[in-house]
Amino acid sequence: MSSLLVALIGAGSMAARHARVVGSCTWASLAVVVDRDLDRAAWLADQWGAASTSTMTAALRCDIAVVATSTPAHADAALELIHAGLPVLIEKPLTSSLKATREVLETAQFHDVALMCGFVERFNPAFLRLAQDVGSAISHVRTVRIGPAPPRTHSTVVDDVLIHDLDLVFRLIPGDTVTEVRSEASGWCETNGWPETVTCSLRMASGITASLRACRHSPTRRRDVSIIQPDEREHSTSLLSPSGNPLAAQFEHFRWLAQHASKVERDAERAGVLPSHELADVIERQLTEARCNP
């Protein structure tokens, strides 16, 4: 069987990680790297024997695509790929606005194109073991995700950091809905007006509660998930330094989604992207309102 030709949109640090995963696969080969910065695209592509370009033409001739460019560019790239019929793995957040996220998802649904969001923690072995250990016996979920500030970002701490844990909450209690959200922020950045630390509490329709904290201005790194069961037993794990490679596991799932999943399974994958983005939007609006009306 011939290798799947992969188009990589973006040439930054996250794109480089995806390139390494593709390069290690026996069933895929990196065909082209697309970036507006052609020198950067060439630098990354040359490491894997791929072509480089600043336009999407070559990408549209590939079999599957990974979108790992800056967040503001996600929507346009994804829509062009979807209209060409290419299965797409798009880094989180899916786009820079809830409106654009819905448009991308609805377009993929209309054309029945496989779409996956890069919620890589879903594939973290530590999280999978924790979820298996507790099953559905959950009373409260607590997450902490802190670390140093990224060199540059086009996303808020909610879209860039907290959204991972919002997604994990929905993975732990599938089908549940949020009935109450309370959010607070601190450490507002003077240059972009965004907070660097966010805490959030959730109440679900089932009565399950969750507390989440995200910070990207800490000298230390923590990625912890704790689950308290109805009998008050607590199960905790760290998501740092997983025993496997979550990004590689995610790419394997993307392969299955693109080649073997049924329409029902593709529908479910697409549907699972929206809840965390909708909740992130609610939190962002709460924080903005609180700052404007202290």
Explain the meaning of each model-derived region:
Residues P72, T95-P150:
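A contiguous active-site-proximal alpha/beta segment in oxidoreductase catalytic domains
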Residues H18, W48-L105:
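Beta-loop-alpha module in the N-terminal Rossmann-like domain of NAD(P)-dependent dehydrogenases
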Residues A149-T209, C215-T220:
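Rossmann-like dinucleotide-binding domain that binds NAD(P)(H)
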